[in-house]
Amino acid sequence: MKQLSHPLGTVYVPGPNDDLSEAYDLYRNSDVTWAADTETTGLNQYKSYFRVRIVQVGTTDKAWILRPEWHMQAINDLTGGDGRPVWWHNWVYDGLGMEESLGLNFDNTFTGAQDTETAFRLIDPRPIMKGGSGHKLEQLGNEYIAYAGKKDARGMILEECKRIHGRECSADNMWVMIPVDNEAYQLYAGQDVFLTARLAEVGMVKLKELQLTRFYEFERPLGWRLAQMQRDGILFDDEWASRVEQEYLDTAEQYERELAEQWGITKGKTAKSYANSAAALIDKFEQFDVVWNKFSDKTNRPSLDKSVIKELTNFGSNEDIKGLANAVFEAKRNHHYAGYIRQMRDELGSDGRIHPNIRPMQAATHRMSISNPPIQQFPRDDARVRGSLIADDGEVIITADYAQVEFRVGAAVSQDKVMTSKIINGEDLHETTATALFGPGFNKGQRQASKPIGFGRLYLGGANGIYKQMAESDTTGYLPTINQVKKAIKAFDTSYRGYYRWATGLKDKTEKTGGILYTATGRRLIVSPSYAAPNYAIQSVARDLFAAGINKAHKMGLGKYIRLVVHDEIVASAPADKAQEIGAQLSEAMSTTFKGVPIEVEWDIKGKRWTK
């Protein structure tokens, strides 16, 4: 059996008939930390070209490189399907990949699966750019194992690949092109095992020291349940999507022509469209006497970001400025929405379904994220993008979403009596800010326009920041002035004094603790800057309540219907004749009471498509 020497241990590369008894003996020894990993042909397990090339298993200093064509029985025996704890780094990726490529049942793999990424996201949620240790295997290895070889191994693989294949090989395709029997590749694979096993031992000690073990035990089954959603995926209507994409492109082209023909905008050498021709647009706006109040950090030229353009579409009575800004805004918006359709098609599995990557603790607040494609960014103001995702045959889409969850959690953690009373009595939480802006006779559109002030102030947002957000997103036509926003903020703070005291007190306390914050559920977060403490505290608790609801829904047998989780919303596909029953059950699973405040759910049957 070939042996390769690595600074952290020995990498064993067995042939088809070599003896693996030592690996089996160590696996059976429950005192030994056992780790595993895979090397694959790509990141999307549901593409037709996806393959698991090797599975590597072992301990802190011994690793075996197993090839599916030779060692399938050993792969099956040594990866935790019997319940023996096996440590992975982002085990969901490897588990789903082995199921799709090798036929290993994902749910069986879960019985023994433990995850170092989950452990270290609990220990320090911050990425490197925010002062944390990061969460990639090589980042954690450099921080906790004091070994910085991972980067060198990647470099060696690329060099080897280029030596063999020349310019044809790149950082993007080297994982497919590098020969499986290349020693640099095998050392890299073995190193993953060494690092994962060593990080597992460090991580479990730290979880215990920080009293976070119960959160790890909570997150483990949650990760499995989210992975089941990823595996099941959601059906994609390509015919609808193609038509919608063309509609967006046609509309964008209409506004592009307007920019060229009506407004005389010329396309710059590097601009992909008239709407991105910054120099020409700035000159044209200045011809209409626009005075700029925001500039690009990189170029120091006037900024044409979304907030600036949106504000100009509501620019007083100057119809030229508003017309030009509207053409720019609509051209960009429609190009952007067409891009979402392309992203869905790029990620489409060979089974005709989208299998998005649902990460349970991606944000610094431990909120979930959904990407590839970025479904949580899909627009709410235009149902056509979401409408590309549909229920299975004979089924309908059901959505279940928390009602004003941030306010409800804010009332619970602050114990503000006025806010709590309004929630319990079903009163309008946005009445205070809407009245301050528009008077007691405000209409529905004006109430909608005032909502960003309440949500912004919940997180101690200032007038300028809240106003910018409103300028970017307002579709009501009732955009207030900055002075009106300041007046509404004062009314909010006066009405909800208890909340304001809690929020400012938490900010001050977090500053004194160096950013360490323990939420109302006991979760440990690291906040920076300290004024973000109320945001972290509320978002994290809301996430824990949502996660508990997901777990409960699965225990009630509803997991087979759930297709997506987006923000605080569950998207399900269920038989039409059972939709009422299943919707009510989802609502029951998600609803709860937290510190005396009801956390309520609104659910709806959408029909065939995930639309309004």
Feature locations, PLM:
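Short, glycine/acidic-enriched loop or turn micro-motifs at the edges of active sites
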Residues: 40-42, 92, 118, 404, ...
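Short beta-strand-to-loop capping motifs
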Residues: 572-576
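A common structural junction motif
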Residues: 587-597
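Short, conserved charged micro-motifs
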Residues: 73, 577-584
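Conserved catalytic core of nucleic-acid polymerases
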Residues: 231, 290-292, 310, 317, ...
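Metal-dependent catalytic core segments for phosphate chemistry
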Residues: 45-56, 64, 399, 406-441
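Conserved "right-hand" nucleotidyltransferase catalytic core of DNA-directed polymerases
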Residues: 1-22, 28, 35-40, 44, ...
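Active-site-proximal helix-loop-helix substrate-binding element of RNase H-like nuclease domains
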Residues: 2-15, 44-207, 431-437
